[in-house]
Every structure is written in structure tokens, then in C-alpha cells.
Amino acid sequence: MSIKPLHDRVVVKPIEADEISAGGIVIPDSAKEKSTKGEVVAVGPGKPLDNGSVRAPSLKVGDKVIYGQYAGSSYKSEGVEYKVLREDDVLAVIG
């Protein structure tokens, strides 16, 4: 993948949800919810501020994150789906 996000944007590769429920039931693709967890694969240089400086991003490549279900834009490259999000759309970093 060759994508470089601008400003305070990050590229996230969604982590697929389990195909089998905790009770052992196989979940078909049509019943799966969109993933809201992912791994950061690219980070922009930071958010430009009014005074001309740039606020450095708080996320880094490799971080596992949770983001809003409808946040960002989808991007597909070589059969893999990615999400391009603003850093503000990321709700939390996982462990």
C-alpha cells in the first residue's frame, strides 16, 4: 500500500470481527457489523494550527484503535479495505 495521509489524518486497517460467536454460532457476512477496531498503518505529519505551527500526531503506526462506526472514508487497495480518519475520529487506543 502506498498512501500518505495529510495533516491530522491516519490510515487504519480494520480488524475483522470474529466469524463465530461466543456461543459457537457461525455469523454470516450479511449479519456482521462493520468493524470499529483497527491498526494504524500510516500517520500524517500533524494538524496545522492557526499560529503556523503543527501539532504532532499522538498516534503512531502499529497502534490498535477504536473509532466511530461511521467515521472516515473507506479506501480499497490491492483487495484490502482501509479507513482514512481524522485523528479526532479515533475514540481510544487499545492496550
Swiss-Prot record:
Pfam families to which the protein is assigned, alphabetical: Cpn10
Subunit details: Heptamer of 7 subunits arranged in a ring. Interacts with the chaperonin GroEL.
Its annotated compartments are: Cytoplasm
A cellular component term, taken from the record's GO annotations: cytoplasm
**Would you tell me the protein name for this molecule?**
Co-chaperonin GroES
Keyword field contains Chaperone = yes
Q: What does this protein do?
A: Together with the chaperonin GroEL, plays an essential role in assisting protein folding. The GroEL-GroES system forms a nano-cage that allows encapsulation of the non-native substrate proteins and provides a physical environment optimized to promote and accelerate protein folding. GroES binds to the apical surface of the GroEL ring, thereby capping the opening of the GroEL channel.
Q: What biological processes does GO assign it?
A: chaperone cofactor-dependent protein refolding
Query: Family assignment?
Result: Belongs to the GroES chaperonin family.
Q: Does the record bear Chaperone in its keywords? A: yes
* PROSITE patterns linked: CHAPERONINS_CPN10 (PS00681)
Q: CDD domains annotated for this entry?
A: cpn10
- Tell me which UniProt keywords the record has, alphabetically: Chaperone, Cytoplasm
Which GO MF term does the entry hold, naming one? Answer: protein folding chaperone
State the species of origin.
Stenotrophomonas maltophilia (strain R551-3)
